[in-house]
Amino acid sequence: MRPILLSGHERSLTQVKYNREGDLLFSCSKDHIINVWFTHNGERLGTYNGHNGTVWSVDVDSKSEFMVSGSADNSMRLWKVSTGECLKAWEFPTAIKRVSWSEDDTKIALVTEQRMGHQGAVRVFEINRDGGPQPDEPLLVFNPIGSKAQVVAFSSLDKHLITGHENGKVALWDVNTGEEVASKEKNHIGLITDLQMSADRTYFVTSSKDKSARLYDSRTLEVIKSYQDPQTPLNSAALIPGKPYLLMGGGQEAMAVTTTSARQGHFEIRMWHVVFEEEVSRIKGGFGPCNSIAVHPEGKGYAIGGEDGYVRLHHFDENTFRAKPYGHETEPKELD
C-alpha cells in the first residue's frame, strides 16, 4: 500500500477532496493555489489560480462541473472545473474556513471566521447552473450564538445544515430560516476540525482536537459510536464507503515534535472498525501532521493532505481489510 507522492504545493495542505466518480482529486493549500489530479496515476491535470491567501477549503459538485473554494483572502470563488475559469468571486469581511455543496448541487454553504469585530457567520448561496449571472447576496445568513462554527455540511435531502464548533458543539439548523433545531455540546470537549458526511448523508463523522472521533445521526445528532485515540489530536476523519471502517489522522503540531520520527509525533493514519470501535491498523504518514483525509467514493483508496506540503494517494490492496476487527491481543498492525 505504498502511496503515490504528489508534489504540486509549496506549503502545507489544508484540504483534499475527491469528485463523485473518484477519478479526480482536488487539493488546496496555504500557497494560495488549488490543484486537480488524476487519481489512477497521480498526474496533475491543472491548477486554479486567483486567490491571494491560504485556500482553506474546496468542494466540487456531483457532476464535476463546478468547484467552489474559500480562502483567507476573504473571498469565495466559483470555478468551472473543465477550463479553470473563475466564474464568480464573492467578498466577505473575514476569511472563509469551510465551503460545502448541497446534495442537489443548487446551493453552497460557507463558514466565515469570527475576527476583527466581525461575528462568525454561516451563509447559504443559491447557485445558477444555466450560465446566467450568479447572485451577489446570500439566500440565508445566520450567526451561531456562543462558540464560533468551524465546519459546515448539508444533511440528507438538504433539509438542514450541520455545523461543528470551536468548543466541540455540533448543531443542526433549519436551512430555510437559520433557526437552531438541535445541538449537542458535551460529546466533544475540543475544537471540531473536520465533519464528513456518509454517502447518503444520514450520518456523519467528526474529528476533534480532544483526540476523538464521533459518529452522529444526521437527523437527531445522537452519537452512534465513539472512537477515542489516547495519543493524537485529530485533524480529520473519513468513512470508507462499503466497508465498516473509518480513517482518522492528525498528530502533534510540527513545532512541538522534538524529532522527525512519524511515531514520535503520532503522524500515522489510524484505521478503526466503525461498529466495534476498535483500532485495527496504522498506516505510516508523512513527516508531519495529517491535515486532511479524503476517501475514494467507491472505497478503493484514500488521499492525505499533509503539513509537509505533499498529497499522498493510497490505493487499498486486498490485505488491507483482513485485520482482525476485535479481540486482538497485540498492538494494531502497522502497514507500509
UniProtKB/Swiss-Prot annotation:
Subcellular localization: Cytoplasm
Quaternary structure and partners: Component of the eukaryotic translation initiation factor 3 (eIF-3) complex.
Record-linked Pfam families: EIF3I
Function: Component of the eukaryotic translation initiation factor 3 (eIF-3) complex, which is involved in protein synthesis of a specialized repertoire of mRNAs and, together with other initiation factors, stimulates binding of mRNA and methionyl-tRNAi to the 40S ribosome. The eIF-3 complex specifically targets and initiates translation of a subset of mRNAs involved in cell proliferation.
Principal cellular location given in the protein's record: cytoplasm
PANTHER family noted in UniProt: EUKARYOTIC TRANSLATION INITIATION FACTOR 3 SUBUNIT I
GO molecular function: RNA binding; translation initiation factor activity
Species of the source: Puccinia graminis f. sp. tritici (strain CRL 75-36-700-3 / race SCCL)
WD repeat segments: 8-49, 50-91, 93-135, 144-183, 187-226, 285-324
GO biological process, one term: cytoplasmic translational initiation
Gene: TIF34
GO cellular component, one term: eukaryotic translation initiation factor 3 complex, eIF3e
Protein name (Swiss-Prot/TrEMBL): Eukaryotic translation initiation factor 3 subunit I
UniProt keyword list: Cytoplasm, Initiation factor, Protein biosynthesis, Repeat, WD repeat
Record carries keyword 4Fe-4S: no
Protein family membership: Belongs to the eIF-3 subunit I family.
InterPro entries according to UniProt: eIF3i, WD40/YVTN_repeat-like_dom_sf, WD40_repeat_CS, WD40_repeat_dom_sf, WD40_rpt
